[in-house]
Amino acid sequence: MLSLRPPCTLSPAPWRRRRTLHGAAGTPQRVSVAAPSAIVEAVSPPARFSFPILVNGCTGKMGLSVAEAVTSSGLHLVPISFSSRDTLDRTVRVGHTDVRIYGPSAREDVLSSVIDEFPDVVVVDYTAPDSVNANAELYCKLGLPFVMGTTGGDRQLLYKSVQDSNNYALISPQMGKQVVAFLAAMEIMAEQFPGAFSGYHLEVLESHQAGKLDISGTAKAVIACFEKLGVSYDMNRMVKIRDPEQQLEMVGVPEEHIEGHAFHLYHLTSPDDSVSFEFQHNVCGRSIYAEGSVDAAMFLHRKVRSNDSKRIYDMIDVLREGSMR
């Protein structure tokens, strides 16, 4: 049993303290994204929110969750998405909408068709870490505003691509509303009290479903705050758990959420082990991220419509503007 507490601590393992989170193409081609076979949810959204969203990554669990959140919010889900493989004649059902999946070789032509029919479309990306930069470069080339919910990739190159193209983008390692608020508080503390934890020892443990290949972007963001607070940390020391058995027995993830969870623990100890601090945020399911992603798309759409001078945003910008539903 892994414990991040000092040996003298007799209280239960930190992950066990609370167990209340049991909730819930081939050849490039021109296409019509308003084909009769694509039936959109018959919900009338408020006029100010009536705009189309294309979710890239509907074949994945996170992308599918976002697509479902789009339709349940009364927004127009563009019935187009993409796969990393050239798979023909495949569709994914989202509510009453059949989303057609295209392979990578068709991306540019299909997206150009989408822009022709929906000039105000916003893309929400939940693909794979190794697709982040190529996707972002294409969105920027076509002038497509996008929300990058996919973590990983070369983040510096990602920001540079957006800056060089002057495109609109919202990039965040974390889309969960309340977790975003926690991150904002951590950043404020780091800015206001630099060096406050100088000399402290930090241990970090994160657990996600086995399908998550990269290290938690949220954990990286929190660690960056601790480093500003004076803590030295080697990312190679982070405990990354992806084994379901360990997640059940050691971390305490509810069995029904093994395939979709995000548990994080940060434990700080003073040089003499006499003082300790612990920060923990655990999420079961994907709804918190899906809803936040829709909020992000709404926010970015408003910025594009108002021709805002700022072009790159994050979820803290959304939070500060009070754009969370």
Swiss-Prot record:
It is an enzyme of class 1 (oxidoreductase). InterPro entries: DapB_C, DapB_N, DHDPR_bac, Dihydrodipicolinate_Rdtase_pln, NAD(P)-bd_dom_sf. One of its GO terms (cellular component) is chloroplast stroma. (S)-2,3,4,5-tetrahydrodipicolinate binds at residues 217-218. It catalyses: (S)-2,3,4,5-tetrahydrodipicolinate + NAD(+) + H2O = (2S,4S)-4-hydroxy-2,3,4,5-tetrahydrodipicolinate + NADH + H(+); (S)-2,3,4,5-tetrahydrodipicolinate + NADP(+) + H2O = (2S,4S)-4-hydroxy-2,3,4,5-tetrahydrodipicolinate + NADPH + H(+). One of its GO terms (molecular function) is NADPH binding. GO terms for biological process: diaminopimelate biosynthetic process; lysine biosynthetic process via diaminopimelate. Pathway: Amino-acid biosynthesis; L-lysine biosynthesis via DAP pathway; (S)-tetrahydrodipicolinate from L-aspartate: step 4/4. Keywords: Amino-acid biosynthesis, Chloroplast, Diaminopimelate biosynthesis, Lysine biosynthesis, NAD, NADP, Oxidoreductase, Plastid, Transit peptide. NAD(+) binds at residues 57-62, 149-151, 172-175. Residues 1-32 form a transit peptide. Disulfide bonds: none annotated. It is found in: Plastid, Chloroplast. The active site is at 208 (proton donor/acceptor), 212 (proton donor). It holds the Pfam family DapB_N. It comes from the Eukaryota. Its EC number is 1.17.1.8. Belongs to the DapB family. PANTHER family: 4-HYDROXY-TETRAHYDRODIPICOLINATE REDUCTASE 2, CHLOROPLASTIC-RELATED (PTHR20836:SF3), DIHYDRODIPICOLINATE REDUCTASE (PTHR20836). Catalyzes the conversion of 4-hydroxy-tetrahydrodipicolinate (HTPA) to tetrahydrodipicolinate. This is Probable 4-hydroxy-tetrahydrodipicolinate reductase 2, chloroplastic.
